[in-house]
């Protein structure tokens, strides 16, 4: 437990930053940190510290922090390890309360480095200076556009707070998150955690008003009891999702060589997660999925799922995963069946999953979703195969029309007139049938119906439906899996899974958190009796 009061508000919302080791040379850590702070849009005061330079990136240079008359809220250190202690001593003398030490070669490299790190911690702690690192990739804060990181990643702004014991992995996951449309409020790579650890930042994010969901990448804990107490305080009002590294003996060895920390017994940590309501992510991919789901979807009231599919196979793939994830296929009430009888063909299955049997009328898709989401017996809705992905029809029409035409010209030139006539005849017949279905119309394709197939219309309907029913609706896109899911999430701020299994997995984790909240609420009520 720290012997001094942390001032993380100034860490994440600094009015001034001094960068020791700032450089004009691309490839140096001092250059990358300086470039990202400036390029990220930070608008506070920036002081570049380098006795060998007159200016860096257009900013005047100072030989040391002693030469700066202004108050410094955040010190960034990117110099060799042997020189860091002297800078920390100067920072304490100046009254600086927060430092990000990017420099490596401390406890992660052996006993000599560990001794230097212990001395750094002693000096900083005695002076009331909170050190992020050493051996960190830095921090990010949406509220001040602060991209104080060692890689050119500029996250989307949002409500996800991220604490990672691997800065490299953390920044990579934020880059993936950016492509998926996930917005971040804060990020901190804790590094070797000389005198601040994951619990300090967890406590801060638990009270942080702009952070609604917390995700963690954890390699080891210095104080399990303190972590447990912090998590117990946070999870009843904010979800925490954790990926624990070092599950096996080989992983534990890798953790020790990475940050110099002990990974600990994984089963013990799993028990801690169950006790505190922390949601476990088993892979980096799942951590990103769950960050997207929890930050964009309401928490369900139970585990009963209504499924709408464009074809039967989608429903089977999803149902296979239900038992693994603790989900229940909702039983459709008679009122819902009768409502769907008005919309779907007479041969539909009249059960969940609701297979819309290739129905291409977009209005009918909306009616099925509305019926499922409004049913009291349904807590979560999964829609599969009805969200197409940006430009799906245009791209595929071009692919399926132009390529055969080219091949026809190349290999069957003499048959080309007959080929063209066949296509024209087919179009004429389609228009004729459309006229029969809609005798009062123009005889062509209904423009309003065509417009409803735009993803933006579908997504807008989902968003309104979720607001109305306060239930999560998860979609699985047809087109190109991960790429399509990423673009749709980025454009719509909704959770779109790349596969049925990942959709069900996310639904299961939402239901698990719902069950925890329900149990916690019951315990709280019991304690007040």
Predicted segment positions?
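Catalytic-core regions of core metabolic enzymes
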Residues: 1-529
């Amino acid at each position: 437990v720290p012997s001094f009061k942390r001032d993380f508000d100034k860490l994440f919302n600094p009015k001034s930053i001094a960068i020791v080791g700032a450089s004009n040379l691309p490839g140096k850590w001092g250059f990358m940190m300086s470039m990202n702070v400036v390029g990220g849009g930070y608008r506070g005061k920036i002081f570049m510290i380098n006795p060998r330079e007159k200016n860096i990136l257009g900013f005047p240079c100072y030989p040391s922090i002693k030469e700066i008359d202004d108050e410094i809220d955040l010190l960034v250190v990117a110099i060799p390890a042997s020189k860091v202690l002297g800078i920390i001593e100067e920072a304490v003398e100046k009254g600086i309360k927060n430092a990000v030490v990017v420099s490596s070669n401390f406890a992660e490299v052996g006993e000599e480095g560990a001794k230097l790190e212990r001395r750094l911690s002693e000096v900083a702690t005695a002076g009331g200076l909170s050190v992020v690192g050493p051996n960190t990739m830095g921090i990010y804060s949406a509220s001040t556009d602060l991209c104080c990181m060692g890689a050119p990643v500029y996250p989307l702004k949002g409500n996800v707070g991220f604490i990672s014991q691997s800065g490299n992995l953390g920044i990579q996951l934020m880059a993936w998150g950016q492509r998926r449309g996930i917005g971040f409020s804060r990020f901190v790579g804790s590094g070797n955690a000389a005198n601040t650890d994951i619990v300090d930042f967890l406590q801060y994010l638990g009270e942080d008003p702009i952070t609604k969901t917390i995700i963690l990448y954890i390699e080891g804990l210095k104080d399990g009891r303190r972590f447990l107490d912090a998590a117990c305080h946070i999870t009843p009002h904010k979800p925490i999702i954790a990926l624990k590294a070092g599950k096996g003996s080989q992983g534990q060895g890798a953790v020790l060589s990475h940050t110099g920390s002990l990974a600990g017994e994984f089963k013990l940590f799993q028990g801690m997660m169950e006790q505190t309501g922390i949601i476990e992510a088993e892979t980096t991919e799942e951590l990103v999925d769950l960050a997207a789901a929890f930050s964009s979807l309401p928490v369900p009231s139970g585990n009963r799922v209504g499924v709408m599919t464009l074809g039967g196979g989608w429903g089977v793939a999803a149902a296979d995963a239900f038992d693994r994830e603790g989900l229940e296929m909702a039983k459709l009430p008679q009122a819902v069946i009768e409502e769907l009888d008005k919309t779907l063909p007479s041969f539909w299955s009249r059960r969940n999953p609701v297979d819309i049997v290739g129905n291409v009328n977009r209005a009918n898709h909306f009616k099925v979703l509305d019926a499922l989401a409004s049913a009291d017996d349904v807590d979560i809705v999964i829609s599969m195969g009805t969200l197409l992905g940006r430009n799906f029809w245009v791209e595929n029409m071009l692919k399926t029309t132009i390529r055969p035409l080219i091949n026809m010209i190349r290999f069957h030139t003499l048959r080309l007139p007959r080929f063209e006539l066949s296509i024209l005849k087919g179009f004429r017949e389609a228009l004729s049938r459309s006229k029969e279905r809609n005798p009062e119309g123009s005889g062509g394709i209904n423009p309003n119906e065509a417009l409803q197939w735009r993803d933006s219309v579908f997504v807008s309907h989902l968003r309104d439906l979720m607001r109305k029913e306060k239930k999560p609706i998860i979609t699985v896109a047809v087109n190109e899996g991960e790429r399509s899911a990423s673009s749709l999430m980025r454009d719509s701020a909704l959770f779109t899974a790349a596969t049925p299994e990942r959709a069900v997995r996310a639904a299961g984790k939402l239901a698990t958190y719902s069950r925890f909240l329900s149990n916690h609420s019951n315990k709280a009520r019991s304690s007040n009796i």
